[in-house]
Amino acid sequence: MVDPLSEAEKSKVTFASLGLSEPLLKAVEEQQYTRPYPIQRDAIPPILRGKDILGIAKTGSGKTASFVLPILELFHRTKTVGSRYASVLVLVPTRELASQVADVFQQLGVHLFPKVKTVAVYGGVSINPQMQAVHGADIIVATPGRLLDLLDQNALRLSDVEILVLDEADKMLALGFADEMNQLVDRLPKNRQTILFSATLGDAIDEINKSLLRTPVTIEVVEEATNLELIEQVAYNVDPTRKGPLLRYLIKTEQMQQVLVFASSTRTADNLVVKLTKNGIQAAAIHGQKGQQVRTDVLHKFKAGKLQVMVATDLLARGIDIQLLPYVINFDLPRSPKDYVHRIGRTGRAEATGKAISLITPDDEHHFKIIQKKMGKRVEQIDTTDLDLQGY
């Protein structure tokens, strides 16, 4: 385990005090990271010392930057870039996460010189461009299946890998990637640094820990409850036929420039986008029936602030991590109170305030009462019967 710090010591930790160089500190500031999350504070120093890591942390805890920053720092210190084969391999369970992790490497490494080349490889798209892209890559972020495909095509080799990151290892196992992970690990050099992150610590993860990690530093970040005090919550009681107009009314009257809208189905998501667009609101949907490239493009535009509204289903939204998101709207309520807190926790992060809005039909009333009870917080409900939605 890492040595515990006093609360006073924790409050004094900065990205500079963690040992990061000026180019990375500049990128951190540009990405509006104010101070290190607990997982970053505890993981960055031992990773820089070459230690193996067993990190127990959930999505949204800041774990991606906790390994991206020290890996980039090591490249900056050694200047060993541009080799024929990658020296860092990051394995992830999904295409969305592969794309996001690669984005974080690129965003935080923007000021490094020489440049560090990061490539994301995943299924669902043509393998041919990826076969070209991995040539000369310093960092490869990959889903296990596509990486094996590339190895079978002799597009790359893993003999130069010095750092292996297993991100969301529990999810990779849950998705049935155990055999692929074992095949890949067998092709890696034995003398390497291994960093494993998992949301949970079960028997399967414990087995991986024993077989892959060498005297690891164990970091367990107790899931910080979503800081509901930073999130302004409000609900609007509305007739089902008026939900669409009310959504458009709220986006326009509150002048929302970046809002994540949750819908219960792909059909609802697509219908919302059509009607939002007709009303002059820039919107796009992200869900399982969209192609991978479309989903990636939508997410990139939304994160960059070039898309006003992103409509998502729960399934596709789980891996989405967006800094300083000001608005979340539940067009449809989620099935469970836990999912509700997870959704609204997309805003109110990094000590920034946010607003979460829910549209409640008469059929939702009982369910919303249960959500409030489980959350331990009463949400103001506003009646919209007399609200003039003509023209929306």
List each model region and its residues.
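Conserved helicase RecA-like core
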Residues: 3-392
